[in-house]
């Protein structure tokens, strides 16, 4: 088993801060049985989970887990945190006006609150939020959080989509853990609002929270993301799913959800017994 010391940020972080005395690379399990979920959907990819109670990692495709990709709309998490922290928006109820340009996604063609824009993953509304934040402020917070390669590039309103900014699945996993436990350099109120915006399913057995992302790399391949956590019995399990395909007709929205649901089901989730 080979691990890149430079990139295994969450694993290294946990060892350094000593979440448990038993936390070590021995707590990392490579689960190649998860390959079937990617093969069945004809995509490449990786999956990683951190069980916070046991301080254990489960990872499929460790090489990809430590490689960096454009964050696409998963960056809406950071964009929201920075905007609320700096007062560019007050909270998830702040209304962002529609720019009047009609787009294919009908949900985007209207005024939206920050919460609605997050739910609909509206690119133009969050581009406006990024412009309000501005380059210098945005860069300061990327540096403070050490978000991926921390590069904004030429355009303040598209750097998370044009492959200027890149982040690894492992780094995304670390970000999710820090967000959940109020360990990011933002006000607790701000982090709570963003956590609430991420809730997708909430019932007696589990609560599933995540943000999706979909963009294109330099080769024109689709890159899909799902980053977040699932809670059962008040215990969080952090996860990151990353997929890639050169097939321009691939239904990334369905594929990433099918893979995540399949993996979590195989692991025993959704029954409230974890």
Residue ranges with predicted function:
Residues 40-51:
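Short N-terminal helix-loop-first-beta-strand/juxtamembrane motif that initiates sensory/input modules
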Residues 52-66:
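Short, conserved catalytic-motif segment at the N-terminal edge
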Residues 25-37, 41, 68, 132-134, ...:
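Structured C-terminal helix/loop/strand segments within mature extracytoplasmic catalytic/sensor domains
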Residues 21-22:
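C-terminal motif of bacterial Sec signal peptides marking the signal peptidase cleavage site
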Residues 68-92, 117, 239:
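Active-site SXXK
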Residues 1-12:
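Bacterial N-terminal signal peptides that target proteins for export
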Residues 85-100, 186-191:
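Short, well-structured active-site flanking segments
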């Amino acid at each position: 088993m080979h691990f890149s010391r430079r990139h295994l940020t969450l694993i290294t972080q946990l060892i350094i801060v000593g979440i448990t005395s038993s936390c070590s690379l021995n707590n990392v399990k490579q689960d190649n049985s998860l390959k079937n979920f990617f093969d069945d959907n004809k995509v490449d990819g990786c999956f990683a989970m951190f069980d916070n109670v046991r301080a254990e990692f489960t990872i499929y495709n460790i090489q990809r887990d430590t490689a960096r990709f454009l964050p696409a709309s998963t960056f809406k998490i950071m964009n929201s945190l920075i905007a609320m922290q700096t007062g560019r928006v007050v909270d998830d109820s702040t209304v962002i006006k529609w720019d009047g340009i009609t787009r294919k996604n009908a949900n985007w063609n209207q005024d939206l609150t920050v919460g609605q824009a997050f739910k609909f993953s509206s690119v133009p509304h969050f581009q406006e939020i990024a412009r309000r934040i501005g380059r210098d402020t945005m860069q300061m917070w990327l540096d403070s959080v050490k978000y991926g390669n921390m590069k904004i590039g030429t355009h303040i309103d598209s750097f998370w989509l044009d492959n200027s900014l890149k982040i690894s699945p492992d780094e995304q996993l670390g970000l999710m853990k820090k967000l959940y436990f109020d360990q990011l350099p933002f006000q607790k109120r701000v982090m709570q609002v963003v956590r609430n915006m991420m809730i997708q399913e909430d019932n007696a057995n589990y609560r599933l929270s995540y943000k999706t992302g979909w963009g294109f790399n330099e080769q024109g391949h689709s890159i899909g993301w799902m980053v977040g956590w699932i809670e059962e019995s008040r215990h969080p399990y952090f996860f990151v799913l990353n997929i890639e395909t050169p097939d321009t007709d691939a239904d990334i929205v369905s594929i990433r959800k099918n893979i995540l649901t399949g993996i979590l089901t195989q692991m025993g989730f959704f029954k409230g017994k974890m």
